[in-house]
Amino acid sequence: MAHKKGASSSRNGRDSAAQRLGVKRFGGQIVKAGEIIVRQRGTKFHPGTGVGRGGDDTLFAKQAGAVEFGIKRGRKTVNIVAAGQAAD
């Protein structure tokens, strides 16, 4: 077997950069409209009230308020509780 492969071949690719996925704002944190809450592949978390979903499944705040994680019908959901209701 040859140790040298030829003029134009490469010696394996290199490691790719991480995608920086995950939860960016945790439960109880205050967010403004447009802030990213979760970066994900697929819908590990589903959008609830006050939360939108981008084309790459990123969840973002549609309104200002406190982030709230919960479970609805067996799915993990993310909601935004308006600032006035957060004290309840």
Swiss-Prot record:
Segments carrying the region annotation (Disordered) are 1-21
- PROSITE patterns xref list: RIBOSOMAL_L27
> What Gene Ontology molecular-function terms does this entry list?
structural constituent of ribosome
UniProt keyword annotation of Ribosomal protein present? yes
Query: What keywords tag this UniProt record?
Result: Ribonucleoprotein, Ribosomal protein
**GO BP, sorted A to Z:** translation
* A GO term from the CC aspect: cytosolic large ribosomal subunit
InterPro entries reported for this sequence: Ribosomal_bL27, Ribosomal_bL27_CS
The family assignment reads: Belongs to the bacterial ribosomal protein bL27 family.
Q: Please report the name of this protein according to its UniProt entry.
A: Large ribosomal subunit protein bL27
